[in-house]
């Protein structure tokens, strides 16, 4: 789908707080489109890159809490995870480059997205998730996405680069009009095929 269609659908999904996945080639505007959709839905944006995470990061750090006059040892969310459990602000969490993430970390993400909790600690009801990934054929280090994680999403959107929309966007962002004119003249040049390019 075109970028404008993608942003419109993503905005509706975020407003409804439904988790979803978007896939597309590198540099096609997946993350930027998700940020745009979040802002259109009047939601705070949190971008996370779980490629740098360990599966145990989501469990938290060991600590102690007082319950009913008793001291209990528990795992307490910290950093990003703590923010998700305490925020009251409508928040869209963009899980970026999820296809590059180790499968064990993807499995840990399933609790957040499906159950809305981290090892028994509830995520705020105001939080929703949007996942983004390149495709395996893009040769962007995508090893695949755990099917159970994909099943936690209500839909998978496939973003394609549209030369006309790209040219219009470049003009609105102040890029040289010659670049936009070139893209309109040679629209196929914006479609990078990693498989064929690396075999030349």
Regions found by a protein language model. Give the residues of each.
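C-terminal regulatory/interaction module of P-loop NTP-utilizing enzymes
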Residues: 1-200
């Amino acid at each position: 789908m075109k970028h404008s269609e993608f942003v419109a659908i993503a905005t509706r999904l975020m407003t409804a707080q439904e988790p979803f996945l978007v896939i597309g080639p590198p540099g096609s505007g997946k993350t930027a489109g998700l940020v745009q959709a979040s802002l259109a839905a009047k939601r705070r944006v949190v971008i996370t890159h779980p490629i740098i995470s360990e599966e145990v990061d989501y469990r938290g750090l060991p600590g102690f809490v007082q319950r009913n006059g008793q001291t209990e040892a528990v795992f307490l969310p910290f950093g990003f995870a703590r923010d998700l459990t305490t925020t009251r602000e409508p928040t869209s969490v963009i899980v970026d480059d999820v296809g590059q993430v180790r499968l064990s970390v993807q499995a840990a993400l399933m609790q957040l997205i499906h159950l809305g909790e981290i090892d028994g600690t509830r995520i705020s009801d105001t939080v929703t998730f949007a996942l983004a990934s390149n495709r395996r054929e893009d040769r962007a280090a995508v090893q695949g996405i755990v099917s159970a994680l994909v099943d936690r999403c209500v839909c998978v959107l496939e973003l394609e680069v549209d030369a006309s929309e790209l040219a219009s966007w470049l003009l609105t962002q102040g890029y040289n009009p010659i670049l936009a004119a070139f893209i309109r003249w040679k629209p196929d040049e914006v479609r990078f095929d990693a498989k064929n390019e690396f075999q030349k």
